[in-house]
Every structure is written in structure tokens, then in C-alpha cells.
């Protein structure tokens, strides 16, 4: 009897000790995570309005870090990272326009497609317009839903380089402030095709340095010194990755994607594969294509979320998938300016 009691006390003592160790470990883990959150706040300049908001955001941050680490422990072709969106729930990220801003087209007026008769078998196996000097450095749209302007400008910067030999960083802010009489509404969203229409009517765009980006809507400033122009624009036939390849082989192309998935939110590197939505909400630019070391074919894309997102601001998404709409819908509404 005495031995049984002693054994019971020993077991209870072990359980209490284990519980204490686990509790201490949880406190230690929480303290480490809190310190990580503080470092993240400093890195991205995040300031919360009060302690309650900070506590809530910390819980979101902690959950997102757990998701990222769990995903990266799996068998995937790409990986995730803790970036500037780490204190947003996916619902917040998905429904906010502050980091995206593409408005899907309800009706697309048919245009020509100058690359229709290009022999796809004669195209290069890989294309990267960065190596041809046709891509400006990564930009950051910040808290303004004007991805449409960044996408249109990047595509225009590319064709201007290819047609004139000059790579010029052009003004997104001119579009944000001045292209407001149609579908495009500055930080509230817009369409790349409408941006191209405005640029044609406006006689071009001025430079980034002459009309710098402000990440906010403002009054249109009178600028008469447009430094680059386009003659028109064309839509790539929808839901046709082969047609998109023909276009991208010849110039950077604006594309729209569904950028709301958590894997897109926290994308860090590799070739994005797997399931993805097609509710288009974000405009980016296809600047090439290629094949990864494991044989996976991919599109090379330029985003406008700064260099801390993705592969220094760029993204690779699987190419030629079974869904004709393309990965995250990127083949649904591609277009490009003409010079």
C-alpha cells in the first residue's frame, strides 16, 4: 500500500513537473515570438493604435508564422516567407484593395493580335526580359490599390525600351491622379487596358522622377513633358497560354491574377504550383518564361510589392497547366501596349 502511494505521488510529481516544463516552454516560445514580432514591426515600420490592436495583430502574426513553417515543412516546389503581410488574416488580405486593385473587365472589345501567326516551335526555350534591359527595378505600390497602373507602366517601359533602346522609369502616379474619368479610379482600382487608352489619349507619360509616386490619390498635375508614348494596345486571346507565350517572347505583357491565396500572400521563392483561384484582383507583368531544374515550366512575373516579397519582388508560376485559364487565372485577361 505504501509502495503504491509512493508510486502514485511519483507519477503525480512527474506530471506536475512535465506540465511546468511545458508551460515554461510555451512562455519561452511566446516570448521569442513576441520578440520576433517586435523585430518585424521595426523592419516594416508597423505601428498599432493601442495595446489591444497590437495584441490582436500579434495573434494573427503568430498564426501566420505557424502556417508558413508548416507549409515549408511539406513537399512543395515553392516556399513561403514572413513578409509585410504577416499581421493580416487571409480574409483581410484577400478583401483589401490597398495592396492589389485590379477590377476584372466585364466586356473586352476585340482587338488584333499581331503574334497570331508566330510559330510557337520557333520560340526560344527561355525568355527573361531583365537580361535584355527591358525591365525597371522592382517598385512598391504600398497602401494604394493601383496595381493596374504599375502593371500597365511596366509593360509600357518594356515596349519603349524595345522600340527606342531607352529604358525609362515612367510615372504610375500620373495614371493614379489623371486617369480617373473611366473605369480607372486611382487607389480604388482599375484596368490595364483602360490605362493604355489613357496613355494614348494623353500623348504618353512623364518620368517617375518628374511625377513621383505618392501611394495616394491626388489632383492631376499639369505635365506637358511626356517622354514616352505608345500607339495602341492589344489583348492576348483569352485562356490560351500558347498565345500568351507568343506575346511574352516578344515583349513584357500585363496579366491579371487571383492574388488572394495565402500561398500568394506569403510567396517567397520557387515555382508556384497547385490549386489557385481565378477571381482576378491583381495586375502584374509577365516578363519571361523558362523551365526549373526539376523540369517544371514556369512564367516569370514582376510584382509591385517591393523586394521583400517573393524572389526579390519577382514571382515564378507554373506554366501550361491543365486549366486553360492558367495558374491563378493569368491567361484570362493578358494585354500589351504597341509602339
UniProtKB/Swiss-Prot annotation:
Q: List the disulfide bonds.
A: 144-187, 178-220, 276-328
Compartment(s) where it occurs, according to its Swiss-Prot or TrEMBL record: Vacuole
Name of one Pfam family that matches? Peptidase_C1
Coiled-coil portions: none
- How far does the signal peptide extend, from start to end residue? 1-23
Q: Tell whether DNA-binding is among the UniProt keywords.
A: no
What are the catalytic residues? 147, 282, 303
Keywords, A to Z, come to: Disulfide bond, Hydrolase, Protease, Signal, Thiol protease, Vacuole
Domain of life of the organism encoding this protein: Eukaryota
Q: Which GO terms describe its biological process?
A: leaf senescence; programmed cell death involved in cell development; proteolysis; response to abscisic acid; response to ethylene; response to gibberellin
Q: What is its EC number?
A: 3.4.22.-
Per the record, its GO cellular-component terms are: senescence-associated vacuole
Q: What is this protein called?
A: Senescence-specific cysteine protease SAG39
